[in-house]
A protein has these predicted regions:
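Residue-level detector of flexible, active-site-proximal loop/helix-junction positions
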Residues: 17, 82, 140, 173, ...
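Positively charged, low-complexity intrinsically disordered leader regions
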Residues: 1-62, 66, 141
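Long, low-complexity, intrinsically disordered polar/charged segments
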Residues: 29-52, 102-104, 155-172
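Phosphate/diphosphate ligand-binding glycine-rich loop within oxidoreductases
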Residues: 42-154
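Glycine-rich phosphate/diphosphate-binding loop of Rossmann-like nucleotide-binding domains
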Residues: 54-66, 155-214
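Generic, ordered loop/turn and secondary-structure boundary motif
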Residues: 6, 11-17, 45, 84, ...
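Alpha-helical scaffold segments in soluble metabolic enzymes
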Residues: 23-30, 97, 124, 148-155, ...
């Protein structure tokens, strides 16, 4: 099946089909193999990715910056402290202004005080921008980490990994942020036809919308 995702936001995996997710994985594996063989790419030459980290992350930041560099592009890091957000600029204005300079925008934002608030802000930014918006983790999903996890499953278990029984635990932790990782994995495995069992204790139930979708 031919897929065309040019200019499309990557905020929720619910906006994608299983074929589209598989295409993303196939392209990622191809680029990873070529990079391992020393091939150089300029697929994103003269392209700039803006990265808003309302909450910090070592791995997410390094992954995006390295990926942009390997593909010939450039990534810029922003926190709320070094943007006009600290002077009470709205998220809408922030997104509108940044879209005039950038080619894509990654946003990492979550707030456990009110579930869904981060996704509402993410959607506010999406509506204000004219460029693709990528979810680097909000309070509902972590789609990019999910795709990385799926790559690891295929690397370790082979191309027949979807026929394996996958068990994922979602449990107690000193640094619980959001249910974004298990909810994204739930959607991805459902779309790809994989068998996922999610184990969690009482009080860690997932969003009803995600359970219904899966």
């Amino acid at each position: 099946m031919r897929t065309d995702m040019r200019g499309k936001d990557f905020v929720t995996l619910m906006d994608y089909t299983g074929e589209e997710l598989q295409t993303i994985l196939d392209v990622a594996f191809d680029l990873k193999r070529q990079n391992a063989m020393g091939a150089e790419h300029e697929l994103l030459k003269n392209k700039t990715l803006g990265m808003i980290f309302a909450q910090p992350s070592t791995r997410t930041r390094v992954s995006f910056e390295t990926g942009m560099t390997q593909l010939g592009g450039h990534a810029q890091y922003y926190s709320e402290d070094n943007m006009q957000r600290k002077n009470k600029e709205t998220w809408e204005d922030t997104g509108l202004v940044l879209s005039r300079y950038l080619d894509a925008l990654m946003v990492r934002l979550y707030d456990l005080e009110k579930y869904g608030m981060a996704r509402d802000i993410m959607n506010e930014i999406r509506k204000a921008t004219t460029i693709p918006v990528i979810n680097g983790l909000d309070d509902k999903e972590h789609p990019c980490q999910c795709m990385g996890d799926l790559m690891t499953l295929q690397e370790k278990l082979g191309t027949g990994w979807k026929k394996k029984k996958i068990v994922m635990s979602w449990a107690y932790s000193d640094r619980v942020k959001s249910p974004g990782v298990p909810q994204a994995m739930l959607i991805a495995c459902s779309l790809l036809g994989a068998d996922l069992t999610l184990a969690y204790p009482k009080g860690y139930e997932l969003d009803d919308d995600y359970m219904a979708f899966a």
